[in-house]
């Protein structure tokens, strides 16, 4: 069994490495999507993909590509954790400990008797970090995604709906997992999100106005928010068409 932290990373190398080190220490393998080739030190990641296109494909497409790549390379990969290079792993549980809990839980939730197929058809979001008034309760922003969920949901086109570039992709993920009865929130797990608007390191930290990091400016505009919200609201009103899982 292996668990992979699968994220795009745009932070300066030295900043990203501080976070990636924590994930590796807890037993995770790491797959990164970077915008520039050759700027990460060897040993920091297990799989690295580089954006060679004219523009960044967006968070959803990047994560989907990473998960697809890992599934093809690592038959032991059972769970994938999304988020960002500002998200830390739960410090009190190893990757394997959490993964075993999840596989047992999701297997018990289904009437099907096929362990390999259904024990990883699920999404789990740690909610112990109560940043910004517990905003994590409505989004699967640093979720654990099971191998079979990733392979089957959205008609086999990846776990994240590809229309989203940054905002609302995590809210759709949560809603879709709820729709198919395979979503679990765990307040006992803390994956601290060092959001740029975080006031302090307490799990109850409020959000305060701060300058937007350069690599996030493009995705934190009113225009992008409005565009993404329209996609989400339209899809939600129609029952998230195309989200159906493969049999």
Predicted region positions:
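C-terminal catalytic/acceptor-binding lobe
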Residues: 12, 165-247
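Short beta-strand-to-loop element that shapes/binds the nucleotide-sugar donor at the catalytic cleft/hinge
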Residues: 109-141
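A conserved hydrophobic helix/loop-capping motif in glycosyltransferases and polysaccharide synthases
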Residues: 3-15, 33
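Short beta-strand-to-loop acidic/aromatic patch adjacent to the donor-nucleotide binding site
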Residues: 76-90
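Short, well-formed alpha-helical segments that are part of the catalytic scaffolds
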Residues: 11-26
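Conserved nucleotide-sugar donor-binding
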Residues: 141-156
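Active-site-proximal specificity loops/subdomain of glycosyltransferases
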Residues: 35-77
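Short alpha-helix within the catalytic core of nucleotide-sugar-dependent glycosyltransferases
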Residues: 91-112, 151, 169-170
């Amino acid at each position: 069994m292996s668990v992979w932290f699968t994220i795009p990373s745009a932070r300066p190398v030295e900043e990203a490495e501080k976070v990636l080190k924590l994930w590796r220490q807890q037993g995770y393998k790491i797959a990164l999507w970077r915008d520039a080739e050759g700027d990460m030190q060897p040993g920091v990641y297990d799989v690295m993909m580089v954006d060679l296109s004219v523009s960044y494909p967006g968070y959803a497409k990047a994560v989907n590509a990473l998960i697809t790549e890992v599934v093809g390379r690592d038959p032991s990969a059972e769970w994938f954790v999304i988020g960002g290079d500002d998200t830390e792993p739960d410090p009190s549980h190893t990757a394997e400990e959490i993964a075993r809990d999840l596989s047992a839980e999701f297997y018990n939730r289904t009437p099907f008797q096929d362990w390999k197929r259904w024990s990883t058809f699920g999404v789990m979001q740690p909610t112990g970090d109560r940043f910004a008034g517990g905003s994590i309760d409505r989004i699967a922003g640093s979720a654990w995604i099971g191998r079979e969920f990733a392979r089957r949901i959205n008609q086999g086109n990846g776990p994240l709906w590809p229309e989203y570039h940054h905002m609302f992709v995590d809210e759709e993920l949560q809603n879709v997992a709820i729709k198919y009865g395979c979503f679990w929130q765990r307040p006992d797990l803390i994956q601290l999100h060092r959001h740029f608007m975080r006031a302090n390191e307490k799990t109850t930290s409020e959000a305060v106005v701060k300058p937007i990091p350069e690599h996030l400016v493009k995705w934190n505009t009113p225009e992008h928010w409005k565009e993404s919200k329209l996609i989400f609201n339209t899809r939600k009103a129609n029952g998230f068409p195309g989200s159906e899982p493969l049999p």
